[in-house]
Amino acid sequence: VLGSRGLGDVYKRQVVIATSGPGATNLVTGIATAYMDSIPMVAITGNVTRDLLGLDSFQEVDICGITMPITKHNYIVKDPAELADIIREAFYIANEGRKGPVLIDIPKDITGALMVYEKKEPKKVVNHNPKGINEEIAAAAELIKNAEKPFIYAGGGVVSADATEEMAEFARKVDAPVSLSLMGQCALDNTKDCYIGMLGMHGTKTAAMTLSECDLMIVLGSRFSDRVLCNAKTFAKDKKIIHIDIDPAEIGKNIDVYSHVTGDVKYILAKLCELLPDMEHEAWMNTVMDWKKQYALRMVPIESEDEVLPQDVIEELSLIHISEPTRP
């Protein structure tokens, strides 16, 4: 059960199973993490028999009520004939649109019930992943074309949309510095020159300077966490922000934006790459690279003849593994 909490910290579809009562409640932290990080997860919990539900029975807990604010959907199975359809639907919901956790609560007598399985034809479902409105994409492209100091900030939405290739091509096309959120660390190869570290509380001075001096911030699949904003009233003040995200609820939730595109990040990035020419911002990029060199994160040297320090091992491995970084 404790291990299942770690399963919420990966990007692919996950399944976790727990017994009733304390087993189910031990899943809550993992489910909440998956919900906040948009990780597809199907959590299956046991419960008391149907005739004991609602009677404060031994190890009975209203896990559906507890997890309602932190799941996309949850189910209490009341008929064994419904179980197969519920499981199929749960996996679909977990992966549809903005990904997230779904919970299935199964009473004990359902798990032991006998039923005749009827093979069913797969249901045709409507894909609710919005592609993005072409007019919004075109408007975003015009803003990017006219920017002199663009800055790209990418989050976990790029990774969950499997848009890393499109992200790399977009960064190359726009010729802009790139910062990644904690969940977006796999969105771009961070050995590229254009990568300048994270923003906000865990960020670099280079990223802060870039945000301060840019004239356009392009935000891809990120929800503007308070770890990044720090102060929403002063964050990117007087900057034009384009927010691209699959979840319309995130647009304007934590910060006002100048323009937005709601839809699948992979599709939108591909369309933007079609609309944009190969751009050059040599003076801007040279300035950012100077900051990156001046404010580079460095290990503080510690002299030790008797022991090998972990930071020295990591630095040496990095030097061996990483070749000279290049622009995308």
Q: PLM ranges: what are they?
A:
Residues 4-17, 73, 193-210:
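Glycine-rich oxoanion-binding loops at beta->alpha junctions
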Residues 12-18, 26-29, 34-45, 68-120, ...:
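Structural signature of the thiamine diphosphate
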Residues 48-69, 190-195, 252, 256:
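Active-site-proximal loop->helix
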Residues 48-49, 106-112, 156-158, 184-185, ...:
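Glycine-rich beta-alpha junction loops
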Residues 81, 142, 147, 238-319, ...:
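Phosphate/pyrophosphate-binding active-site segments
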Residues 108-135, 139, 284, 295, ...:
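Aromatic-enriched
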Residues 158-242:
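Glycine-rich, anion-gripping cofactor-binding loops and their flanking helix/strand elements
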